[in-house]
Each structure stands twice: as structure tokens, then as C-alpha cells.
Design a protein with these regions (language model features):
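Charged interaction scaffolds used for protein-protein
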Residues: 1-170
């Protein structure tokens, strides 16, 4: 009986949500490196970890680790100002200095209510500053947008937009 294990092979295969979950893993908190990598497989959608352990050979673990070697190198240095999700184009606000008070308060509130750390706060920030072209800010949409971005944006897209944050204004 053949089993399939979901393994990303490039940063573009890793969603924002998966990246957030990966950032919570501390290799030192695991009994072995194998346990650590098995936990990583769970994050990538391999729900039946006990079944996986039954058929994966030690040599397979080495192959799995090699396939995920891309994680040892940073994602490509992209410069994204917009992304397309499910056929809809979302664009970053053009100038961070032009955030409205309502937008700023929404970001702060989402971060405080969720007790989010710097990585976990990325979807909250994006839910306010990454909008469909021409759309005005609507605080009623932020929770749905956070989930959309966590599940549909690759971490490569997100990090590509981080260039925008590092210079503040375009």
C-alpha cells in the first residue's frame, strides 16, 4: 500500500499559516531530530502522523529532510507590491504614513487581542494594508482577510512584500 507524504520543496509551497506554525517549533524541545521533522510534516498537512510513522523508513526521513533543504536558505529577494488570490488582485497601501487612525487602531487591536508575536501578527497587519484595488478599509473584513492570507499567501509572497516595510514608503 502506497502512502503519500506532503512535502514542500520551495518557499513558494509554504503558506503564511504554515510558516507561523513552523516558527513556533523549537528543535531543542524535541526528544530527537526525527520527532522534530515529523512535527514539521504535520504542519504541512500530513494529518495522520501515527500512520506515517508506521511506514516511513529511517532512510526516507533523510530523503524528506533533503527535500526540505530549501528552508536552510532565505527566500528569493522579491519585491511584491501586489498579489493575486483566487483571481482577485490585492495591493499594498502605497504609503505607510497615510494609514488612517482607524486602520492603525485595527492593527493594534488585532495584535493585542490575539496576544500576537512579531511573526503571528503578519496576517493582522496584512488584513489592513493589503486590499483589493480600489477598496476602502472596512474593519468588518479583517478577520476573514487574516484567514484568507494565512491559507492562500505563500511565505515567499509575504517576504517579498517585506521590502515594502523595510523602506516604509514607495
Amino acid at each position: 500500500m502506497s502512502k503519500e507524504i506532503l512535502i514542500p520543496t520551495a518557499w513558494e509551497d509554504v503558506t503564511l499559516n504554515e510558516f507561523i506554525e513552523l516558527s513556533k517549533l523549537d528543535i531543542d524541545s524535541f526528544d530527537s531530530h526525527i520527532d522534530y521533522y515529523i512535527s514539521m510534516l504535520g504542519i504541512f498537512g500530513n494529518d495522520d502522523l501515527n500512520n506515517i510513522l508506521e511506514f516511513v523508513k529511517l532512510t526516507d526521513v533523510a530523503d524528506i529532510i533533503n527535500q526540505m533543504a530549501f528552508m536552510n536558505t532565505p527566500p528569493k529577494n522579491l519585491d511584491h507590491k501586489e498579489v493575486t488570490i483566487k483571481g482577485e488582485v490585492f495591493k499594498l497601501i502605497e504609503n505607510m504614513n497615510e494609514l488612517t487612525v482607524g486602520e492603525y487602531i485595527s492593527i493594534e487591536t488585532l495584535i493585542e487581542q490575539g496576544k500576537l508575536d512579531s511573526i503571528s501578527s503578519i496576517p493582522a497587519i496584512l488584513s489592513v494594508i493589503l486590499k483589493p484595488i480600489g477598496e476602502k478599509f472596512d474593519s468588518n473584513l479583517v478577520n476573514a482577510r487574516m484567514e484568507l492570507f494565512k491559507n492562500e499567501l505563500s511565505i515567499e509572497d509575504v517576504l517579498g512584500m517585506s521590502v515594502f516595510f523595510s523602506i516604509g514608503v514607495r
